A protein has these predicted regions:
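Surface-exposed patches in mature extracellular/periplasmic domains of secreted proteins
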Residues: 77-79, 200-208, 329-331, 355-358
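A domain-level signal for caspase-like cysteine endopeptidase catalytic cores
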Residues: 30, 38-49, 61-65, 130-256, ...
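Structural alpha-beta junctions
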Residues: 72, 189-201, 318-329, 353
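Long terminal accessory regions outside catalytic cores
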Residues: 12-108, 116-119
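Structured catalytic cores of large enzymes
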Residues: 69-168, 305
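Sec-dependent N-terminal signal peptides of Gram-positive bacterial secreted proteins and lipoproteins
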Residues: 1-10
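Catalytic cores of nucleophile-dependent amide-cleaving enzymes
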Residues: 245-339
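Active-site-proximal C-terminal subdomain of hydrolase catalytic domains
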Residues: 295-426
Length: 428
């Protein structure tokens, strides 16, 4: 009897899953059930107790929570999967939408190594107390270029345009409150504005915002990333792993309905009750090639997967959307290395360099990968796999800097501190 009934039960579950996967819209009941599950997940992951737990305790707590949700019929028990390497428990909601719980928070995956923490890492020299201007000093050529730009503005002859490009920083590392990261990005925004790169800072990044990247010449994705593995298939289970970008946009009943098609098609998933974008999200958003004037620079961890399993789907999706060039990291990247590379690259784009030349300059300055940078700072116990920046697309892409822009002829009378003194003082 058992031998006959068990396959029948499995078949029934598989039929339910097949029907759910055939959906193209979420019902109000589906969204309400997801919100019930999300409330339980966020109550766990947002608790002080969860924050104080060890990695193993978090994993156990996540599995226990999902077990309870499976008993209530809110998630599919057969979909629950633990990814030890990437610190995620993935699952599927009963309606077919993908979700996950991070038991290794993103900040730990890309830890700056400023404290021992669970990783037992020693800090590089003095970086714990570094101000933005100290951590990210101006190279001499950038100082001269900034001064030259101001001189050119003051002269009618060979005057430069007020704007050499439009940039957007999509800042989704945190909500900026008591943030150790945000002051650096505010500093960069102010400096780039002075160079003539009109820079928008978006600190409440939504999926809708990521559909409007074609408005800018340079888009900077400053967010956490992860390598997400999930199970799919009604009767024959298979697994798939792909990079995702974690946003700070909270899931709501209304947004679940609005995003229903993208959630059900797995272009968007939920992690800790927050929305995340996949490569297919970008592929669909820019299927008409709207990014033809845009360079995309991603700081997210594992944007291109990991060593031994490089995944170019994010870069390919953006290039298919017309992006002139796409930059991103393989593996988890140290925070300071990542933003230092960004700082140097964009500074040199503002000087008129091509994106290929600017990236080469940044690597020459800070190292080919983050372990080289880490050891040069005096670090003694680097993480296991070096993160390195890869450029796809046209290495000759550049901002609208005039060909007659001459640093040497225009840097005699003014210093960068005169131009950006207020920015430097505020960031110090």
């Amino acid at each position: 009897l058992t031998a006959i009934l068990a396959p029948a039960a499995w078949a029934a579950e598989g039929t339910d899953e097949a029907q759910a996967e055939a959906k193209t819209t979420l019902t109000a009941a589906d969204a309400a059930q997801m919100q019930q599950a999300d409330a339980a997940v966020t109550a766990l992951t947002g608790s002080e107790e969860y924050e104080q737990m060890s990695r193993e305790q978090r994993r156990a707590a996540a599995l226990d929570e999902l077990d309870g949700l499976a008993r209530k019929g809110l998630v599919r028990r057969s979909s629950i999967r633990t990814d030890e390497e990437n610190g995620i428990v993935s699952f599927t909601y009963s309606c077919g939408v993908l979700g996950g719980i991070l038991f290794t928070p993103a900040d730990e995956l890309e830890e700056m190594t400023l404290d021992a923490g669970e990783n037992g890492l020693r800090p590089p020299r003095g970086l714990a107390e570094a101000s933005p201007s100290a951590e990210m000093p101006l190279t001499e050529d950038v100082r001269e270029a900034a001064a030259a730009r101001q001189n050119a503005r003051q002269s009618d002859e060979n005057a430069l345009p007020d704007t050499i490009g439009r940039a957007a920083i999509y800042y989704a590392f945190d909500n900026t409150v008591n943030s150790s990261r945000f002051p650096y990005y505010s500093y960069m925004q102010g400096f780039w504005e002075g160079m003539g790169i009109r820079t928008t800072m978006n600190t409440r990044v939504t999926l809708a915002d990521l559909r409007r990247m074609d408005r800018y010449d340079l888009c900077i994705l400053s967010a956490h990333g992860a390598y997400y593995t999930y199970s799919y298939g009604a009767l024959w289970k298979r697994t798939r792993t792909e990079p995702i970008i974690l946003l700070t946009e909270e899931s709501t009943f209304y947004k679940d309905i609005v995003y229903s098609f993208e959630l059900l098609s797995h272009r968007v998933i939920k992690m800790n009750g927050l929305y995340c974008a996949t490569a297919d999200f970008f592929r669909n958003a820019y299927r008409a090639g709207q990014l033809s004037s845009t360079i995309v620079y991603s700081e997210t961890c594992e944007f291109l997967g990991v060593t031994g399993s490089v995944d170019e789907s994010m870069a390919e999706a953006l290039l298919a959307g017309g992006a002139r060039a796409v930059l991103g990291y393989v593996n988890n990247v140290y925070t300071v290395y990542s933003r230092s590379m960004l700082w140097d690259t964009v500074n040199h784009l503002g000087m008129g360099m091509t994106i290929g030349g600017a990236v080469t300059h940044a690597k020459d300055t800070y190292g080919e990968n983050d372990i080289i940078w880490y050891t040069e700072q005096g670090g003694r116990r680097p993480h296991a796999a070096a993160a390195y920046l890869v450029l796809y697309g046209d290495p000759n892409a550049r901002l609208n800097v005039p060909a007659n822009y001459s640093v040497a002829q225009r840097a005699d009378e003014i210093t960068v501190d005169d131009i950006f003194g207020e920015v430097l003082d505020r960031a110090a």
